[in-house]
């Protein structure tokens, strides 16, 4: 899960991931404190989601991180509603919006479209959690509490 972004099938695959990764990490570092934590969280969460729900195939490359960063940066601007994240969201969408949509379409078996999707889900969840930590806690809290027995059960 953690080493997947470091493994690539070819030099072309490495270059195809490296260029957007440099741009997206630059945008992340310029707009967020502790950007390295966000990147690691996307790698781990996206990798876990892919491990649970992904196809039985070899998933290589930094696509989980790339797609996670795209969605994180775009939705971060939407959720946070602050000037810098909004500008970063617009720049990210202009640069990578088309790639984002096309990346979810399974075109060949060599492309991990499900890795793209899992990275995007991780990025979206982290963007929401960062902007609304209390709301996420409120939504998850009922799932962790034991429910009292229903009253009037005749006992």
Regions found by a protein language model. Give the residues of each.
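Long, low-complexity, intrinsically disordered segments
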Residues: 149-155
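A detector for small-residue-rich transmembrane helices and their helix-helix packing motifs
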Residues: 1-149
